[in-house]
Amino acid sequence: MSAVTRCEDGLVLRLYIQPKASRDSIVGLHGDEVKVAITAPPVDGQANSHLTKFLGKQFRVAKSQIVIEKGELGRHKQVKIIHPQQIPPEIAALTE
């Protein structure tokens, strides 16, 4: 499975999360996953909620339209984004 996969109702992303980064950003490809740096620490689900908020802004969707399918407690996650309104250039380059 590739890092970004289209499905009938949106996108499925395989992510590698770097918590406690200096700023939030989509870094790029990291092996067969997309590396995302976030500023939140990996404590009590803070990183997951921060990740959904960040991805919501990037894809212009509500937080409820971002579902962490796998990897709730790890750095390797599979995230589904339902009906994205826009696709960031870093992700769009990987879908082609």
UniProtKB/Swiss-Prot annotation:
One of its GO terms (cellular component) is cytoplasm. Gene3D superfamilies: YggU-like (3.30.1200.10). Transmembrane segments: none annotated. InterPro entries: DUF167, YggU-like_sf. It holds the Pfam family DUF167. Belongs to the UPF0235 family. This is UPF0235 protein YggU. The lineage of its organism: Bacteria, Pseudomonadati, Pseudomonadota, Gammaproteobacteria, Enterobacterales. The gene is yggU.
